[in-house]
A protein has these predicted regions:
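Jelly-roll (double-stranded beta-helix
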Residues: 1-320
Length: 320
């Protein structure tokens, strides 16, 4: 169950779409691949891998963690590690994660919260289970998105934005069948709380069985829909989509997703009814990409410099 819910979505502002719009067709649907990250937790990753970086640009990576039920003393996280050249956006649907960084920041990312960290010139951080989760176990479900920075912002000072659940912009469709949690960017004249260096739109949408959502979409942006759970269709042509799949849209100025009317049985995430989907897109940066581990730069020389700077302690030190 998503962390931020509303008993009656019809009390929320509704996303309206003009009549003379051009629906974006679905250019492809891609399956995620399975990966092991951090200290051994499992993720589903649609990109990089299923689609090329030129397709996901300005995003480089999307990981879905869980949903998983941890037994006591079973949960693991991502110990201290560096980043440079991009932003990490960690969104927690269920459970909680503790985080710390080399600039003295820290706290707990709770259900419905988003941690928006601009690594920029460089920072060290960790994301680990809280003491409560370690002791008692519990459900964990989250998403991490890497947003690239253009070359002139690769060395911008590190920044942290704690976007708590109560600050999300909540919207709905004209019939109230969709709950839209706008994390960043603009949808139909409404803005999310995230302050982005790179122009993007990022939203978490839950659709009731059979419900449809059509949203206006910046024609200069790319557009993708990633299925967190459930089954449904994407685009005006109703391409089937299911859990852990990424739908990539072609040109146009509206995006449509629809939940299956009756699913009949639970999918791999345990979701038998609703369609849970991330809508994301942004203005492509269209610059060369050099990637190595936790660094995302433009050239191999910049990657080598990042490694040298990390080894020299120039990206920060782990607090004692």
């Amino acid at each position: 169950m998503p962390a931020v819910t509303v008993d009656n979505p019809l009390v929320l502002p509704r996303i309206e779409v003009a009549a003379d719009t051009q629906p974006r067709p679905v250019s492809g649907v891609y399956a995620s691949h399975h990966a092991i990250e951090g200290a051994g937790f499992e993720v589903w990753r649609p990109f990089p891998g299923a689609v090329d970086a030129t397709v996901s640009d300005p995003f480089f990576l999307l990981d879905q963690l869980g949903p998983v039920e941890y037994a006591p003393h079973e949960a693991v996280g991502a110990p201290w590690h560096p980043h440079r050249g991009f932003e990490t956006v960690t969104y927690v649907l269920d459970g909680e994660i503790a985080h710390h960084d080399s600039n003295g920041g820290g706290g707990v990312i709770g259900e419905g919260d988003t941690q928006w960290m601009t690594a920029g010139s460089g920072i060290l951080h960790d994301e680990v289970p809280t003491e409560r989760v370690l002791a008692s176990g519990g459900r964990s479900h989250g998403v991490q998105l890497w947003v690239n920075l253009p070359s002139h912002l690769k060395f911008t000072p590190p920044r942290y934005q704690p976007l708590t659940a109560d600050h999300l912009t909540l919207l709905t469709s004209p019939d109230g069948g969709a709950l839209v949690r706008l994390i960043a960017g603009e949808l139909g004249g409404h803005r999310g709380p995230g302050d982005t260096h790179t122009p993007i739109t990022y939203a978490h949408v839950t659709l009731s069985p059979g419900a449809q959502l059509t949203v206006p979409w910046n024609p200069a942006f790319n557009a993708m829909a990633y299925v967190l759970g459930g089954r449904g269709h994407a685009g005006a042509e109703a391409r089937p989509i299911t859990a852990h799949e990424l739908a990539v849209f072609g040109p146009g100025d509206t995006v449509t997703v629809r939940a299956a009317a009756v699913s009949g049985s639970a999918d791999a995430t345990g979701n038998a009814d609703e369609l849970d989907v991330l809508l994301l897109g942004g203005l492509p940066i269209r610059e060369p990409i050099a990637h190595y581990g936790p660094f995302l730069m433009n050239t191999k020389a910049e990657i080598l410099q990042a490694i040298d700077d990390f080894n020299a302690g120039k990206l920060g030190t782990v607090p004692s």
